[in-house]
């Protein structure tokens, strides 16, 4: 996170909270803690100057902040002198501080008046504000958000002047060029915009993770470059979970778009400050605060491409003094660092965010490693033990009637013992009879097996809350493996709202595990979504929080039809296999037949076997007879043909004889006639 701007942060980390030094004089140091409060400290005497708590500091926590530039402050101060009601005549009247929130609104806070100056909401962002940049010449400021848009605001009218889409994903960082005509924006890729036309001038490769800081390192381009005010300038970029800070140069469109050089540090950079180079011979001084609490100092002349990453010239650490041999020095995290006006000293902010220590340290160019011993035992630093001791258990009278269960996360109310009469004192009276041990044991009612202790109605809710806050696997298993639906509903109804999202995340993680546990988690998920639907609908980042769960449910629903078909087929196959196995094992009951057919005896069968041999001979004889019959038939046919021929000849003879008779001729002799007869 660069000074004067805001970036993404992790509230649980020792560093990474939105903070910034006031411009030019660095008289104030502003930081927004994770509890939503804004604190302004005086750097000269390390005294708390102001403290401001926004009305919606719990739901809309501060995500980034930026001081108004000194030039704009002087202009605002001159305008305010005209008012009689605010005749202060000081330049600090317009020390405005812009605060970006998690719900998309921007607050303008006046450190002089100690109250809210104005609020920018209408027509702006719909999601978390990641970075704010003031324009150095006019009354505009620019903001970017997770909703992918960049918004140009007017601080006088508190309205949107222009709004355009900056990237396909969330835009995490902004930076205005020294001449005020260009704007750098970054998500994962870096874009250079022309503010007048809102068009992209150049594209840069960027980082693999979201960019958290952008800073121009030079004011004027080199003399060899075209004098368009932007070509040839260098700027610096740092990203989340990236130990390299890349340096880019604005070149012509046809040239390479990768980084010209890079600086390497020991951990992720959380705060970056630098001194601008006014000419090509002046080196750039860079101070990088890492998440591990160290400060790395670099000094390099930007002149073209450099292949190897550059290491720091000096490293600064702070530790507690080791008093004696038994006491080990402990490191003190450095939270922020900024160069002073002389560029030879450094303002360090270290300790904790509730009571930071601000110190000015002189730089020595000869030392490569500086370790400062500081005692911060006098500074108030809340610990876990002090937080636990502040939780007090309410004491209730035995006659009081409790209408609602106790607050989840606290112990059950402790009832006062019944008031004892004054006679039951420890003092013994002379002459009084003392009860025996047997009588005392009988009065103590040691038989507790028949009795049942009064169960706390909120015990499961308390266990679930403690398990989610401490991430205790055993406690979560004990609670989430409950199969009683009524108990699940009562538990979900009593949990506090702050653990609803962690509970949904835990259920989503368990839904991806074993199928047996997933069936139980569905009951919990159904109760949570049903009971706390109104609360979930008010969350601004609900889509990101429940995106994994939604995709998981969609994938399960898409495969449900196929799984049901497969389930039906498998049931059919298994049923048939089991039925066939059962039928084999079962014995059929004995039944009497209505009709019995008895075949011939075996003796008759043996007699019948002998003719079977003769049947072959008979078969041959039959074949011979058939062949003879066929021959006889052929002979008969031949005889019939001969008879027919004889008949035809006789008819012809008769015709001849009849003709002769008609003619009177007769060739027949008596002898021949007798022969014929």
Swiss-Prot record:
Note on domains (UniProt): N-terminal domain is required for nucleoplasm location and C-terminal domain for nucleolus location.
Chief subcellular location: nucleus
PTM sites of type Phosphothreonine: 320, 393
Subunit composition and interactions: Part of the small subunit (SSU) processome, composed of more than 70 proteins and the RNA chaperone small nucleolar RNA (snoRNA) U3. May be a component of the proposed t-UTP subcomplex of the ribosomal small subunit (SSU) processome containing at least UTP4, WDR43, HEATR1, UTP15, WDR75. Binds to RNA; binding is required for its chromatin association. Interacts with CDK9, DDX21 and SUPT6H. Interacts with RNA polymerase II. Interacts directly with UTP4 and UTP15.
Alphabetical list of SMART domains matching this protein: WD40
GO molecular function: RNA binding; RNA polymerase II complex binding; transcription elongation factor activity
Compositionally biased region (Acidic residues): 598-654, 664-677
Name of the protein in question: WD repeat-containing protein 43
Pfam families per UniProt: Utp12, WD40
Record's keyword annotation contains rRNA processing: yes
Designated gene of the protein: Wdr43
Family assignment from sequence similarity: Belongs to the UTP5 family.
Positions bearing the Glycyl lysine isopeptide (Lys-Gly) (interchain with G-Cter in SUMO2) cross-link: 308
Annotated GO CC locations: chromatin; fibrillar center; nucleolus; nucleoplasm; small-subunit processome
PANTHER family reported for this sequence: WD REPEAT-CONTAINING PROTEIN 43
Superkingdom to which the source organism belongs: Eukaryota
């Amino acid at each position: 996170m660069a000074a004067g701007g805001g970036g993404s942060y992790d509230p649980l980390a020792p560093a990474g909270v939105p903070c910034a030094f006031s411009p030019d004089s660095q008289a104030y140091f502003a930081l927004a803690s994770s509890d939503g409060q804004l604190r302004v400290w005086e750097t000269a005497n390390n005294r708390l100057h102001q403290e401001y708590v926004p009305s919606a500091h719990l739901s809309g926590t501060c995500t980034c902040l930026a001081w108004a530039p000194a030039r704009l402050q002087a202009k605002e101060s001159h305008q305010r002198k005209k008012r009689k009601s605010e005749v202060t005549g000081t330049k600090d009247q317009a020390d405005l501080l812009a605060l970006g929130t998690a719900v998309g609104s921007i607050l303008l806070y006046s450190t002089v008046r100690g109250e809210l100056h104005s609020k920018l909401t209408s027509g702006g962002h719909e999601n978390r504000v990641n970075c704010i940049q003031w324009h150095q010449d006019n009354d505009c400021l620019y903001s970017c958000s997770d909703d992918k848009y960049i918004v140009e605001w007017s601080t006088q009218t508190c309205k949107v002047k222009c709004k355009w889409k900056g990237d396909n994903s969330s835009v995490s960082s902004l930076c205005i060029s020294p001449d005020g005509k260009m704007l750098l924006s970054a998500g994962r890729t870096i874009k250079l915009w022309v503010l007048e036309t809102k068009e992209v001038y150049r594209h840069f490769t960027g980082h693999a993770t979201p960019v958290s800081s952008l800073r121009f390192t030079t004011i004027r381009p080199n003399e060899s470059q075209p004098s368009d005010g932007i070509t040839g300038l260098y700027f610096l970029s740092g990203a989340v979970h990236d130990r390299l800070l890349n340096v880019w140069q604005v070149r012509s469109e046809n040239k390479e778009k990768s980084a010209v050089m890079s600086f390497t540090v020991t951990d992720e950079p959380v705060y970056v400050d630098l001194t601008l180079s006014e000419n090509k011979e002046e080196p750039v001084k860079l101070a990088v605060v890492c998440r591990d609490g160290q400060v790395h100092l670099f000094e390099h002349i930007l002149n073209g491409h450099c292949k190897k990453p550059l290491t720091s010239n000096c490293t600064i650490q702070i530790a507690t003094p080791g008093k004696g041999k038994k006491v080990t020095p402990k490191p003190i995290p450095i939270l922020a660092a900024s160069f002073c006006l002389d560029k030879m000293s450094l303002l360090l902010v270290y300790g904790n965010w509730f009571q930071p220590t601000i110190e000015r340290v002189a730089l020595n160019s000869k030392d490569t490693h500086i370790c400062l011993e500081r005692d911060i035992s006098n500074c108030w630093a809340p610990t876990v033990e002090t937080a636990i001791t502040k939780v007090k258990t309410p004491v209730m009278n035995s006659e009081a009637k409790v209408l609602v269960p106790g607050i989840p996360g606290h112990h059950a109310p402790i009832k006062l013992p019944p008031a004892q009469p004054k006679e039951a004192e420890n003092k013994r009276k002379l002459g009084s009879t003392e009860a025996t041990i047997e009588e005392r044991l009988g009065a103590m009612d040691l038989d507790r097996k028949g009795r049942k202790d009064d169960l706390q109605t909120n015990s499961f809710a308390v266990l679930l809350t403690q398990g989610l806050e401490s991430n205790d696997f055993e406690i979560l298993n004990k609670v989430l493996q409950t199969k009683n639906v009524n108990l699940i509903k009562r538990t979900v109804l009593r949990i506090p709202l702050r653990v609803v999202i962690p509970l949904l995340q835990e259920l989503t993680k368990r839904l991806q595990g074993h199928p047996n546990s997933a069936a139980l988690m569905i009951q919990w998920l159904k109760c949570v979504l049903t009971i706390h639907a109104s609360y979930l609908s008010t969350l601004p980042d609900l889509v990101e929080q429940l995106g994994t769960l939604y995709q998981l449910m969609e994938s399960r629903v898409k495969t449900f039809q196929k799984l049901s078909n497969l389930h039906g087929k498998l049931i059919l196959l298994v049923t048939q296999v089991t039925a066939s196995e059962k039928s084999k094992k079962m014995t059929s009951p004995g039944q009497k037949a209505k009709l019995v057919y008895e075949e011939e005896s075996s003796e008759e069968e043996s007699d019948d076997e002998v003719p079977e041999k003769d049947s072959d001979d008979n078969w041959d004889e039959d074949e011979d007879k058939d062949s003879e019959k066929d021959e006889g038939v052929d002979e008969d046919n031949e005889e019939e043909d001969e008879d027919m021929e004889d008949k035809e000849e006789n008819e012809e003879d008769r015709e001849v004889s009849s003709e002769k008779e008609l003619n009177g001729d007769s060739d027949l002799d008596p002898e021949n006639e007798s022969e014929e007869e």
